[in-house]
Amino acid sequence: MAGHEVRYGKHRTRRSFSRIKEVLDLPNLIEIQTDSFQDFLDHGLKEVFEDVLPISNFTNTMELEFVGYEIREPKYTLEEARIHDASYSAPIFVTFRLINKETGEIKTQEVFFGDFPIMTEMGTFIINGGERIIVSQLVRSPGVYFNDKVDKNGKVGYGSTVIPNRGAWLELETDSKDIAYTRIDRTRKIPFTTLVRALGFSGDDEILDIFGDSDLVRNTIEKDIHKNPMDSRTDEALKEIYERLRPGEPKTAESSRSLLEARFFDPHRYDLAAVGRYKINKKLSVKTRLLNQTIAEPLVDAETGEILVEAGTVMTRSVIDSIAEQLDNGLNKITYIPNDSAVLTAPVDLQKFKVVAPTDPDRVVTIIGNANPSDKVRIVTPADILAEMSYFLNLAEGIGRVDDIDHLGNRRIRAVGELLANQVRLGLSRMERNVRERMSVQDNEVLTPQQIINIRPVTAAIKEFFGSSQLSQFMDQHNPLSELSHKRRLSALGPGGLTRDRAGYEVRDVHYTHYGRMCPIETPEGPNIGLINNLSSYGHLNKYGFIQTPYRKVDREAGVVTNEIVWLTADEEDEFIVAQANSKLNEKGGFAEPIVMGRHQGNNQEFPSDQVDYMDVSPKQVVAVATACIPFLENDDSNRALMGANMQRQAVPLIDPKAPYVGTGMEYQAAHDSGAAVIAQHDGKVTYADADKVEVRREDGSLDVYQIQKFRRSNSGTAYNQRTLVKVGDVVEKGDFIADGPSMENGEMALGQNPIVAYMTWEGYNFEDAVIMSERLVKDDVYTSVHLEEYESETRDTKLGPEEITREIPNVGEDALRNLDEMGIIRIGAEVKEGDILVGKVTPKGEKDLSAEERLLHAIFGDKSREVRDTSLRVPHGADGVVRDVKIFTRANGDELQSGVNMLVRVYIAQKRKIKVGDKMAGRHGNKGVVSRIVPVEDMPYLPDGTPVDIMLNPLGVPSRMNIGQVMELHLGMAARNLGIHIATPVFDGASSEDLWDTVREAGMDSDAKTILYDGRTGEPFDNRVSVGVMYMIKLHHMVDDKLHARSVGPYSMVTQQPLGGKAQFGGQRFGEMEVWALEAYGASNVLQEILTYKSDDVNGRLKAYEAITKGKPIPKPGVPESFRVLVKELQSLGLDMRVLDEDDNEVELRDLDEGEDDDVIHVDDLEKAREKAAQEAKAAFEAEGKE
């Protein structure tokens, strides 16, 4: 037997063909959401408050301090929040201290700070009753970036940018004349020496001393001349900068100083964030810049006087490692003192080294480091600016390297916690202005924190973020896999990110740093390709938001691959050589061969095994969860694999799903972590179990009660139904499955079914990827799914009185009311068809011009004679089903309703949808098609043992698409069916072709895995042997029931008077320009005329035509279409006197559109009137006959 047995949970064993020992289990797959939110509650929120507070008033006599905060119990439980359309949120109370500095009085008070949405255990938020997900955002990291650019003459120039988390950008660039310029916040450029002088280093010699002698520096100094001898060089530089930042305002050195200080050196206005400081220190550190340079002066330890490195030494990695501690502690530190008129007068510490120029051995180049400022410094310092300029000047000398902005070392993830913190910060800074004003205006003696704090800006910012941010998305809940994928999604779009139109090819492309961090396969097709990605299966965020991936450390000394796991970010990995997970190891755990395949930066090549630093932990660490669910992924073309991964997320949960015979072993973990199953929280023993709840007695005696969800409506209208797996007496451990969720079977993801599939053509019905299906799949409900739709009706107060929910509906027969209860609401369990009444409702009618008699009656009898019109909630077109549930909300019961609403009724209708012609089916390899014919079982081809085939696919769908994985799955699936086993073939480490053929032989199949098929209609065998096997097929969410649509009479657009378009508006089919040409070409003049008039926008014509049809009279001639009138009006507005004449040269009167219509859509009222008129005339004629 090939392969070995592996247990997945307590309910499933699979035969696995994996060969690679996995030393690390998959992490919890939704930790990117849950960990980030927990970190926000533990640290992020506190940091935001500490950033903005304390707040002082303008005279600095009062100060408001932050003490702490407490999050209390949520108002609603999860279930209540869902039912009441409320948010699952907890009140937050913040304690503030108000200090009066004049009197020394301190007032401490707790202030209610609004309700804060709380994340559920599943990593989602419930906002206004709907489940939402905050998608993590992929943004450019703050830090310093260097780039090169080639001008039109082929000359290479350089640029550099300091990008903060928030605040002004500082840019450097060279021009074609070899002069270096700087720009502050995207303004006009000035020579970079001007900024250096403004920082307090004003003399030319001083600048040359700091940066060393080079052409760039000399050229720039020559350009930057002293224009006004009255000013010092620093003051002149300050004024020049002020002129750039505030053109047209009177410039003084003092105002420039305060402006620059506010722009760069004020923590309230400028923030690098922890990650920005980390990136700047890393980039400007002398350690990386000295690597492989030849030192020009000996390096001496300042304390001991010991010579650490002799002049002329090449600074290799080992030399730098030997003096790393001294470098970190400020080796070669020089302190420069700025002059008194500088922006900041504090001394500036730099680390300064001299190295031999790589391009000219006789020249010396100066390298300046920023002397590693502390992590707490979140602003850019003068040392950073000078070190950045030094790096920039070094680039021209060939020292240092430019950055690749698509490298994942330069892009980071803003997960939910950080996005929320930014929103709270935004709200607090709006609140801050408000607080300052109130502190200054009101009487100091009686002020309390409660009085000066207005929480509205903060709650508004949070509400807006959850309700309408691009990153707050309605959860994709087609099935558990789509939920999981949505929680792990990384979007480059959104506020502060890219936009679709501006994103080029480079940003969207796969980068070598994506390996193990972002999936190269799973991304949408279409305009968002490459901008929306998915986290790889082992990906994990570090504290700075960079994605890490795990590797096994290689002990070079011992020549062994250890089981020690090291998590590396993309820029850390660049320094090492990493071997692939499938490198062969010997018994000792070392590499079996002297040469192994490995990666170093962007190169995949062979390396001597003694040079390798790390090894991949698993072959599936490259891909995301959905991609890792595709068996034989290694045999599929990547474009088709992309479709396969995306289509699994569109699978509809079936009534009786089955896990795949051929899986990848990922099905268990994906189902477990998706949040759709019920998982045991503690060890214990089951004491009670039914379909609705399970009780587990813990070892300490306490009782856990797990509620099982039955047929709840998911976000996408499918049935969210959980099924209990345990029975009384079972012992469960923490993490065990208590109940399967939708699309699960025995604790494994089960998106579809395992039908018997044959690759063969049949009467041409599977042309162009169409799918031919056996009627068995319809009769046995194999691909039947349940869909729940929610309809609601509310009663409001109108000007003419309140609307009413009632059984007494005007002009409706008793038959239509048979399923309504005494209130007028449909009973649960009733079968309804389109047009049936769900909730009977009447609205008072506007009483237009009552006659004197009516007014008298009205005065005598009150409301009895008042007119009402029927505004009942009816089943819309194309919908039918069984009423599953009715929920009634009223003010009287204490339900929170919108203002003006007295009662709200929600009706849930369940629909059982069998598979039918027009539904879309797919495999896991991007092989999708539409059901074209459902054939009776007796006519389907059958196997020699009499088993009929379930599905026939076209063999031509395979070769050109290059997704051969489906054929491998087909054969292995048949073997698994015959052997009665389930199989796991993990991606990139699955069944080889030998394993496949061994298993086929073991199952007693023919050596070519094909079989003779017999035609079900004649009993004759087909000419050739056919590939028949079991393939996992799923039914997708694109169902024909949602798309089928027909209209006879419906709404018309207000302006053009033409029918609306689209199924949602109950619109017509557009008969466009080209269709009109077709009718013209055939000379079908009468058809053409009615298409352009009655059926479109001839308002009077269509009324008369309707009347003629109802009375059985000949249809009158059409009039002038409304669009023609619009054209005439347009020409008249251009001053052309245009009139319409008939064949006798008489002018045709064009009616104006009715004034006073304020509705965008004219409904079928005109036709209703025509119907009423016809009915009245018929009644009158009948009465007249009676009299005669």
UniProtKB/Swiss-Prot annotation:
Reactions performed catalytically: RNA(n) + a ribonucleoside 5'-triphosphate = RNA(n+1) + diphosphate
Signal peptide range: none
InterPro entries for the chain: DNA-dir_RNA_pol_bsu_external_1, DNA-dir_RNA_pol_su2, DNA-dir_RNAP_su2_dom, DNA-dir_RNAP_su2_hyb_sf, RNA_pol_bsu_bac, RNA_pol_bsu_CS, RNA_pol_bsu_protrusion, RNA_pol_Rpb2_2
Record keywords: DNA-directed RNA polymerase, Nucleotidyltransferase, Transcription, Transferase
GO MF annotation list: DNA binding; DNA-directed RNA polymerase activity; ribonucleoside binding
Top EC class for this record: transferase
GO BP annotations listed: DNA-templated transcription
PANTHER family: DNA-DIRECTED RNA POLYMERASE I SUBUNIT 2 (PTHR20856)
Similarity field: Belongs to the RNA polymerase beta chain family.
Function summary: DNA-dependent RNA polymerase catalyzes the transcription of DNA into RNA using the four ribonucleoside triphosphates as substrates.
Subunit (UniProt): The RNAP catalytic core consists of 2 alpha, 1 beta, 1 beta' and 1 omega subunit. When a sigma factor is associated with the core the holoenzyme is formed, which can initiate transcription.
Protein name: DNA-directed RNA polymerase subunit beta
Species of provenance: Streptococcus sanguinis (strain SK36)
Gene: rpoB
